[in-house]
């Protein structure tokens, strides 16, 4: 009985040492792709069209409207894209 246990242990140890059991290896986490940034239309955007030059101090609905109508999208902590 001891001989069988010893042989099984040695066989499994040999397979592990040769890399036959763990072929996958270490896989690192897949990095998240950068968020999609739409191109800015030409020229600065001013108050005349309802979208201020800065993202600061505008409401969520106004920011969403500027993003959908003109492609000027605000990102948290970064201001307008582009």
Swiss-Prot record:
BP term (GO), one: defense response to bacterium
Places the protein is found: Cytoplasmic granule
Disulphides: 51-66, 55-73, 67-74
Domain of life: Eukaryota
Tissues where this protein is expressed: Higher expression in hemocytes and to a lesser extent in heart, testis, gills, intestine, lymphoid organ and hepatopancreas. Traces in eyes and subcuticular epithelium. Not present in the brain.
Keywords in alphabetical order: Amidation, Antibiotic, Antimicrobial, Chitin-binding, Disulfide bond, Fungicide, Pyrrolidone carboxylic acid, Signal
GO cellular component: a single term: cytoplasm
Pfam family, one: Penaeidin
Signal peptide: 1-19
Modified residues (Serine amide): 81
Pyrrolidone carboxylic acid found at: 20
Coiled-coil intervals, chain numbering: none
Protein biosynthesis among keywords: no
GO MF, one annotated term: chitin binding
Protein family (similarity comment): Belongs to the penaeidin family.
Described purpose of this protein according to its UniProt entry: Antibacterial activity against M.luteus and E.coli bacteria. Antifungal activity against N.crassa and F.oxysporum. Presents chitin-binding activity.
UniProt-recorded name of the protein: Penaeidin-3b
Organism the protein comes from: Penaeus vannamei
Classification lineage: Eukaryota, Metazoa, Ecdysozoa, Arthropoda, Crustacea
